[in-house]
Amino acid sequence: AAFTLWGADLRRDFTRNRMRRFGQACVVACELPDDIDRLHAHFLHTPASVTRYAAIMRGLPWSGSAHAKDIWTTPKWDIREKLGCLDWLVTCTQSGADYLRTLAPDPETVSLVHHGLDFSRFAPPDACEHMSDTPNTPLIILSVGRAVPKKGYNDCLQALASLPPHLDWRFRHVGGGPLLNELRDRAHGLGLEDRIEWLGAQPQGVVLSEIRRADVFVLPSKQTPDGDRDGLPNVLMEAQSQRVAVLSTRMSGIPELILDGETGVLVTPGDSAALSDALCRLLEDPALRAKLAQAGLERVRSHFSM
């Protein structure tokens, strides 16, 4: 049965990846201990395909989790097939859940479970400590994320280059990724190299320290041509947990966390002019930053804490 199912999938997706998935499923099915009662796939693309085939080979029920790229870049026919034979699936954004339910034979199969933040690990700083009498000079704009197209860092650099010259700021980026050298070159071309520090990938402790010293956190997420996009980036919750004003985009599940003008600021994805205007407002208005930072902390604590 699994071989027949895989053959039907292969006719629609004749790729090495599809061939490899069946081989991986054979290994899983052969090596699986006898006391396993259920298989669970943590992503809806390759892991779910392997799990689906292996579950059929072993006669086991299976379930799944879905996040972002695996939802938006997996073909609809493939999602329909998987949702039609698993027991249940959880996903972490309302936008993802709504989309998956349109493809599920039974929409009740799909459940929403937002990611949560452990406040024992991300305890917020004291309000007086964060809003000291000696604010950062220059003001610090921080972003944490991989240097990949969906993070929108080209838009971010253009927005930074468009800021009024009287503003005194520095941009700090934490994260690795394949576009890092390209972004450095673009920053140089825009004349920003003296205002930007690229820190590369860092352990969580360093990331948390960087967040705590920031005045504004920015993540200009966008959709790429192949449909890839963020879901609800955990780093936005982490930034808000540290009383930092957050600026992002109306992308996927981000508006489920950030209420524009109330707990942060949202702009249209890919709109570098709007991003620059929003950054300018935040940099020029410490009272607005403090208001949004406190409201963001309260929303994360009340709606997204574990």
Segments and roles (model prediction):
Residues D133-A161, R172:
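Conserved donor-binding/catalytic core segment of Leloir-type glycosyltransferases
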Residues L257-G261, V265-S272, R281-A287:
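Conserved acidic donor-binding segment of nucleotide-sugar-dependent glycosyltransferases
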Residues A201-P203, S209-A214:
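Short alpha-helical donor nucleotide-sugar binding micro-motif in glycosyltransferases
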Residues V174, N181-G205:
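Nucleotide-activated donor-binding/catalytic signature segment of Leloir-type glycosyltransferases, i.e.
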Residues L236, S241, A245-S248, I258:
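Short hydrophobic beta-strand element within catalytic cores of glycosyltransferases
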Residues R212-R229, V244:
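Acidic donor-binding loop of glycosyltransferase active sites
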Residues S95, G116:
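Carbohydrate-associated surface elements
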Residues P75-W77, R101, L117-D133, T137:
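Acidic anion/phosphate-binding donor-loop and adjacent secondary structure
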